[in-house]
Amino acid sequence: MCTTFKAAIFDMGGVLFTWNPIVDTQVSLKDLGTIINSETWEQFERGKIEPDDCYHQLGSQIGLPGSEIAATFRQTTGCLRPDARMTSLLRELKGQGVAVYMMTNIPAPDFHQLREMHYEWDLFDGIFASALEGMRKPDLEFYEHVLKQIDTSAAETIFVDDKLENVIAAQAVGMVGLHLTDSLATCMELRQLVGC
């Protein structure tokens, strides 16, 4: 192992998985944006609200039945696909002796649905799903919790996310943060960081 980094933490959606939702729903893209940026959704991602209560509250906010909100997210999660380039990079990192983790904001039902998907889950040394941990990005306590759980210093950890605010939070606790805007460029940057 030639790298000084011991761990790499990756976001899921938009980083390790891509999605092109082809969803048959009454929920507009605008409403979807309103939902995922709401306090109710953030509490759902922290595991603080039961699914039926969350979907009912969100449905009331946009004038649709909660069952329609639930169905939309089941379909959307079903549209996630692993990014082959990033999966290959995970294998490379493991080969370099770097522990690989996933840290994602995700409600429990979506996480359990995702885990049913055929994927190389054994690549991960650990998975931190917000709803199961009771905290979410960009809350600094979530990053500190993960560092404690993986028993690695922030300076020895690389963090990759497609949301800039999450990268800034990782940098605030001392991690090397990479903002993914293009998977090829990010893969190259990661290889440079850990390469011999």
Curated annotation (Swiss-Prot):
Organism superkingdom: Eukaryota
Reactions listed under catalytic activity: (S,S)-drim-8-en-11-yl phosphate + H2O = (S,S)-drim-8-en-11-ol + phosphate
Protein keywords: Hydrolase
Enzyme class: hydrolase
Any GO MF annotation of the entry: phosphatase activity
Pathway assigned in UniProt: Secondary metabolite biosynthesis; terpenoid biosynthesis
InterPro entries xrefs: HAD-like_sf, HAD-SF_hydro_IA, HAD_sf, PGP-like_dom2
Enzyme Commission designation: 3.1.3.-
Induction behaviour: Expression is regulated by the secondary metabolite regulator cclA.
Protein family membership: Belongs to the HAD-like hydrolase superfamily.
Biological role stated in the UniProt entry: Sesquiterpene phosphatase; part of the gene cluster that mediates the biosynthesis of astellolides, drimane-type sesquiterpene esters that show antimicrobial, anti-inflammatory, and anti-tumor activities. The first step in astellolide biosynthesis is performed by the sesquiterpene cyclase astC that catalyzes the formation of drimanyl pyrophosphate from farnesyl pyrophosphate. Drimanyl pyrophosphate is then dephosphorylated by the sesquiterpene phosphatase astI to produce drimanyl monophosphate which is further dephosphorylated to drim-8-ene-11-ol by atsK.
Protein's UniProt name: Sesquiterpene phosphatase astK
Organism of provenance: Aspergillus oryzae (strain ATCC 42149 / RIB 40)
